[in-house]
Amino acid sequence: MAKTLVSAAMGKALELGYIKSLNDKVIDYIPNLRGEFADQVRVVDLASMTSGLKWDEGTSDPFSPVAKQYFINDVEELMLNQPFIEKPGEKYHYSSGNTQLLSLLIEKASGIKFDKFFEKEIWSKINPDNDAYWQLDSKEKGNIKSFCCFHSNARDFSRLGKLYLNNGKWDGDQIIDSLFVKRSMTPFLENFDAYGIGVWLSDHRDLNISLMSGHQGQYVIMIPEKDLIITRLGERDIDLGGPGVSGDVLVYIDEALSLIQD
């Protein structure tokens, strides 16, 4: 679910002027990128998983880049050695590397460590019940593992869902720009309708469904037509086996809808 949070922080950095445009080139903020297409990648391509970054998201191979992200002591160095090998903005390819680079970009643009930026601009504004924390790659480097490792509880995750459900507004205050939130909850590519800008999408049962999705089966599911948030922290039971919303999400949606209709 951390990927949605990093995307939200990107929207806030845009609103505050740290990022001038979502069409800005990433290389203007992170100059030492690699690969044939490094100078073409836009900020929004990172958040929409269309950057063309060379990446294997499989965790079964301990030498894959995503596996290394979990145990390496310098995640920034790892990311700066991953090349961009495809033309950006055209093809969806889910990549934790995109999110890690995006949080680094926010740090470079704002001059503020990502966890501090997120806490100040978003987390503290939604009145959380408890503290939360991001994991670091190591004490020596102190890089935030933004691709995965945000730790909170169901009630406070639900608050983040409510923030999106209310188009970025919390208790009358506009925390994130409403147009950005609406754009995030709209398919980014015409030929792939399951992902927006940092948000998973589905039209199950003819409802417009948006969700934050975690690696092990954690979900915050938002259904605007029903003014409904479904939060689930636990292990995934069902997988569709391909890109898109996992099958267990649809089970939780059906169960929740049956409860409110009874």
Model-derived features: positions:
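Active-site Gly/Thr loop motif
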Residues: N130-D131, Q135, V181-T231, D239
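Solvent-exposed loop and edge beta-strand segments that line ligand/cofactor-binding
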Residues: K87-Y94, I144-H151, M212-S213
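Active-site-proximal alpha-helical segments within enzyme catalytic domains
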Residues: N98-L105, S146-K169, Q218-G234
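Flexible glycine/proline-enriched surface loops and loop-helix/loop-strand junctions
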Residues: S60-D61, P83-P88, N98-Q100, K139-S146
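Short, gly/Ser/Thr-rich active-site loops of penicillin-recognizing serine hydrolases
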Residues: G241-D262
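Active-site helix/loop module of the DD-peptidase/beta-lactamase fold
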Residues: L16-K54, N81-P83, S110-F147, S152
